[in-house]
Structures are given as structure tokens and as C-alpha cells.
Amino acid sequence: MSAPVQCPIHPDVHLIEDHRAGDLVCPACGLVVGDRLVDVGTEWRSFSNERSGNDPSRVGAPENPLLSGGDLSTTIAVGFGGSDSDNSLANAQRKSMNNTDRQMTAAMSLIREMSERIHLPRNIQDSASRIFKDVLESKALRGKNNEAQAAACLYIACRKDGVPRTFKEICAVSRVSKKEIGRCFKIIVRSLETNLEQITSADFMSRFCGNLSLPNSIQAAATRIAKCAVDMDLVAGRTPISIAAAAIYMASQASAEKRSAKEIGDVAGAAEITVRQTYKLLYPKALELFPKDFRFVTPIDALPNS
């Protein structure tokens, strides 16, 4: 019976699958532990009659500018029961491996894994990896948890690319606390002097309404309700997420597509009581908040007051 695949240095750490490189990577130290996912497809091709000016022949993966060597280097890992010479070779190579590259490789795998879980596109992953590279070079987060750093970089990349995710969403696909991610986020923004656009409730409307299977008419009404509430200074001190959730609750309750405060809170990552408390701030001005052309199924005076 074969021994389980695990990092010889951190045997209790859950390994990350790097599908593109075909590797199993230890997120704690960046060690490539196994290669069970290698793509068996053709690695290169060449046709003499192709008209393209570029030579299509290529062996190996393209260079990665985020690594000092330009590409991922192979690290020898030895399972339990390996010979003394194997262990000596692995230890020598691990010691000689660039520490920055080791951290970078592990971080890119973490970022890719988290991104895939919440269906973020490749450009967001690349942006987060570049931010992580800048953080490494700045040494601002030296000694901080590698996964917390990667999660914070992913959060910032989402903000910068106009597809913001909440701290709770990022926390849910990582193995670190929201508090740790938040600390790293603050340090990164300060040290890199990163300018981030202010988040508004409108940034979340499309995704929240889509996840609730609400029609465009409800999304449009909720967007207007939230914007007017902010303009009228009804929701001072409330987060864009809770404002969006409360506006969706109000718009849906006035329509045939009703959704409960709990349903909306679950999608938005807000507590039901938070949705209701924010809604109570909107309710007295409901007549002014709704679009003029909104088709009420439930009139304003019949809406829940909390």
C-alpha cells in the first residue's frame, strides 16, 4: 500500500492542487510534493506549412514574470521511507531555493484555488498575484500568514477590477479569519499606497439579485432605492452591503417576487437583523425612494414596517 502524499516538512497541512502545472504544492513552504495531475496532452507541435510568422514549436510552460527565475523550478520532495541520499538531496535543494519564489509559488496556488471556488476570472487571479509580488518586495507583511496575505490581495484585486467581493466571501474560501485578512488588507493599502474606488451598494446589486433569481425590474428599483437613501442621508453609518440588502428587501416586498430578510441576508452575507434594522431606516421615506414607474403589487402602506 502506497504512503499518503504529504509534505515531509508540514505533514498536517492540506496540499493545494496546481492544475496547470500538474503539481501538489504545500501552501506553508511552497514545496512541490507530487505531480499526479500532469497533463498528458501534446506538449508541442510544429507544421511546416503554417503561414504564421511565429514558430509554434514550444516545449514546457511559458515564462512567469512574477518569479525571479522566469518559471517554476522543480523541487525534490521525499516521502516517508526515502533513502538518506534522497533526503540529503531534497534538503539541499530546498535550502538553495529562492525564498521569495517559494512564497510566490505557494501564494499563486492559493489565489488560484480561492478564485476558482468563487468563480473569479483569470485576470483577477493575475492581478492578485501581481499585488502579492509587490507586497513581498515591500516586506511590509513579513512574518504574516501567507494565506491571509493572498486572501487580502485577492480582495484588493476584486475591488480594483470593479468586481468587489465581501470580506466574508473571501474568508469563506480561505482557511484564515476575517480579522487576519482585514489586518493584511490595511497594511497592504497603506504600504503600497493603493487607491481603491469607494464601494457602493450598486456594486453588489447585480450579483445579489441574480443569486436571488430576481428580475431586472426589481434590481433597477432596489438600485434606485439604495442610491436615494444615501443621497437623503437616511443610512449614515451603514455598510453598502446592508444598504443593498435592505433596498432589495423593500423592492421585493412591494412586488410579486417577494424574498425574506433572511434569504437576502444569506446571499449578501449580512445578518437578518441587520437587513431589518437598515430597512426600518428606509421605510418612513418609502414613497420617495421608489421609482415613479414602479408597478406595486403590494402598496406601500401594506409593506412590512420592519
From Swiss-Prot:
Q: Origin organism of this chain?
A: Caenorhabditis elegans
Write out the similarity annotation: Belongs to the TFIIB family.
The task this protein performs is described as:
General transcription factor that plays a role in transcription initiation by RNA polymerase II (Pol II). Involved in the pre-initiation complex (PIC) formation and Pol II recruitment at promoter DNA. Essential for early embryonic development.
- Subunit: Associates with TFIID-TFIIA (DA complex) to form TFIID-IIA-IIB (DAB-complex) which is then recognized by RNA polymerase II.
Q: Which residues does UniProt call coiled coil?
A: none
Q: Name one GO molecular function term.
A: RNA polymerase II general transcription initiation factor activity
| Main localization category | nucleus
What this protein is called in its record is: Transcription initiation factor IIB
Q: What is the lineage of its organism?
A: Eukaryota, Metazoa, Ecdysozoa, Nematoda, Chromadorea
Where the sequence repeats fall, as residue ranges, is 114-190, 208-284
Chain intervals annotated as zinc finger (TFIIB-type): 3-34
Instruction: Enumerate the InterPro entries for this protein.
Output: Cyclin-like_dom, Cyclin-like_sf, TFIIB, TFIIB_CS, TFIIB_cyclin, Znf_TFIIB
Which GO cellular component terms are attached?
nucleus; transcription preinitiation complex
Q: Which Pfam families match?
A: TFIIB, Zn_Ribbon_TF
CDD domains given in the database record: CYCLIN_TFIIB_rpt1, CYCLIN_TFIIB_rpt2
Q: What happens when the gene is disrupted?
A: RNAi-mediated knockdown causes arrested development at 90-100 cells and inhibits differentiation. The two E cell daughters (E2 cells), which form the endoderm, divide abnormally early, immediately after the MS2 cells. Phosphorylation of the RNA Pol II large subunit C-terminal domain (CTD) is reduced severely in embryos.
Q: Which domain of life does this protein belong to?
A: Eukaryota
> Which key words are in the record?
Metal-binding, Nucleus, Repeat, Transcription, Transcription regulation, Zinc, Zinc-finger
